[in-house]
Amino acid sequence: MRDLTEYVCKAMDMLDSIGIKYGNIIDCTVNTRAQKRWGQCRKVPGGYTININAVLLDEQNSEDGLMNTILHELAHSVDGCMNHGANWKAVASRIYSAYGYEIKRTDSAEDKGVIESTRQIEYKYQFRCEKCGKVIGRTRASKFTRNPKWFTHRGCGGHFQKI
C-alpha cells in the first residue's frame, strides 16, 4: 500500500510551486469503508481534514488517480472552494494547466485507473431488468428499492424485479 502522507506532501509542493494557497491541513486519513467516494475534505476547527479511499492507495492502481484525488481535495481547502463552484473550477483549471491533472467533480473507477477487482461494492439490494437482463445494485433503501416496478430501465424501457 502506498504512503498517503508522502503523496499529500508531494501534492502540497505542487500547489505551492504554482502559488495556490490551500488551507491548514490538520489530518489526512485512509478511508477503508467508503464505497462510493474517492475522497473527502472536511472543514474542522483550525483547518481541514482529508480522507482518501484505501482503494486508491493499492499498488495495482494508477498513481495518477491517487494524485488527482488528493489535488481535488486540497483544492476544496482553498478559500471559497468548499463546493464545486466557479472558484473551485478556477483552481482545478490552474492545476490542469500546470500539471495536466484533469480535476473534475466526479470520476469513474476507469478514470481513476482503478482495477475493478480491487473495488468491491457490497450491494444490499439487487434488481434485474425483465427485458434486457441487466443487473443493478443499490446500497440504501429508497423509493426504487421499495417499488422497483414503478421504474423503467433507461436503456431498454423494461421494468425491474428484485433478485
Q: Predicted regions: what is each one?
A:
Residues 1-68, 77-163:
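Active-site-proximal or metal-binding-adjacent scaffold patches in catalytic folds
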Residues 73:
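Walker B catalytic acidic pair
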